[in-house]
């Protein structure tokens, strides 16, 4: 009799390849892990590469609570051309000589797009407008507007400015940039808006996500590597990286698992999700403080 395969619970940090949707990666991981219970936290455009956080088995319950509010990217912005999608995947809709744009002007434009800003997401995106994905409306040629949304760009740095010539002969500038931003920020839209501010248009030509919340690229594995050896971050380790920790004694652990709302120390008030750990180091549950007591968000013990 063969031993039944058991997929470990935990997070898988994937280095997503270009050309794959986030759903493609989930489908691939279901085959690798031999389970249907795989989900992802946050998405990456098909063109982009880098960190995509997946949850396997019980860890799928963790995904919705992960404090993945801050993300970090490396990318390339081309000044001098606009595209339909604000990235290199879309059709070029305008070209303008960008060779006279100065570094001072670029830095001033970047400064305007830093900090707490209102951003209009790209029209070719998954945002729903009256229940319909905006990319579907865009593909059908609809004329519509997406309301601006508040986002935070903690850091927007330009490392290099390179002269280049586009395929149609237009002199353009390629900027190598890094961005640290809140969840929901469109790097494509930053490229578009920087180009608009400089009067020459702009779009994103390359993007690599290097961090999502506490999970960095150095912990990520390619799909080929995961096919060879499935590397899963145990739930307890994943929770320790993402949430404040509350250690409880054996009695409190038992009460918590039986649904009793325990009194929580004041230090956890207003801190969002908190990981509860028993004396043996087992991750029991995610809770949040509500009127001084622990409200269960997800139970793992």
Swiss-Prot record:
It catalyses: uridine(55) in tRNA = pseudouridine(55) in tRNA. InterPro entries: PsdUridine_synth_cat_dom_sf, PsdUridine_synth_N, PUA-like_sf, PUA_sf, tRNA_psdUridine_synth_fam2_C, tRNA_psdUridine_synth_TruB, TruB_C. It comes from the Bacteria. Pfam families: TruB_C, TruB_C_2, TruB_N. Its EC number is 5.4.99.25. The active site is at residue 45. Keywords: Isomerase, tRNA processing. One of its GO terms (molecular function) is tRNA pseudouridine(55) synthase activity. It is an enzyme of class 5 (isomerase). One of its GO terms (biological process) is mRNA pseudouridine synthesis. HAMAP family: TruB_bact. Responsible for synthesis of pseudouridine from uracil-55 in the psi GC loop of transfer RNAs. Belongs to the pseudouridine synthase TruB family. Type 1 subfamily. NCBIfam families: TruB. This is tRNA pseudouridine synthase B. It comes from Streptomyces avermitilis (strain ATCC 31267 / DSM 46492 / JCM 5070 / NBRC 14893 / NCIMB 12804 / NRRL 8165 / MA-4680). The gene is truB.
């Amino acid at each position: 009799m063969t031993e039944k395969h058991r997929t470990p619970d935990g997070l898988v940090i994937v280095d997503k390849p270009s050309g794959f949707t986030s759903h493609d990666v989930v489908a691939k991981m279901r085959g690798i892990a031999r389970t249907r219970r795989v989900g992802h936290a946050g998405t990456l455009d098909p063109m982009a590469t880098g960190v995509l956080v997946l949850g396997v088995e019980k860890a799928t319950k963790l995904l919705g609570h992960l404090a993945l509010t801050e993300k970090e990217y490396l990318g390339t912005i081309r000044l001098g051309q606009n595209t339909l999608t604000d990235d290199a995947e879309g059709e070029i809709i305008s070209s303008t000589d960008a060779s006279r744009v100065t570094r001072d002007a670029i830095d001033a434009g970047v400064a305007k797009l830093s900090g707490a800003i209102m951003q209009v997401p790209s029209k070719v995106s998954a945002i729903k407008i009256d229940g319909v994905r905006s990319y579907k409306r865009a593909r059908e040629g609809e004329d519509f507007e997406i309301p601006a949304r508040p986002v935070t760009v903690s850091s927007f740095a330009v490392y290099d400015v390179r002269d280049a010539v586009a395929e149609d002969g237009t002199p353009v500038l390629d900027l190598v940039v890094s961005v640290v931003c809140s969840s929901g920020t469109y790097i494509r839209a930053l490229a578009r808006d920087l180009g608009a501010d400089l009067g020459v248009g702009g779009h994103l030509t390359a993007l690599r996500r290097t961090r999502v919340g506490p999970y960095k690229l150095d912990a990520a594995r390619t799909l080929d590597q995961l096919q060879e050896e499935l590397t899963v971050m145990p739930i307890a380790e994943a929770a320790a990286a993402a949430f404040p920790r509350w250690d409880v004694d054996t009695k409190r652990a038992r009460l918590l698992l039986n649904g009793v709302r325990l009194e929580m120390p004041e230090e956890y008030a207003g801190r969002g999700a908190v990981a509860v750990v028993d004396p043996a180091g087992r991750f029991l549950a995610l809770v949040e403080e509500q009127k001084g007591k622990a409200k269960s968000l997800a139970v793992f013990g």
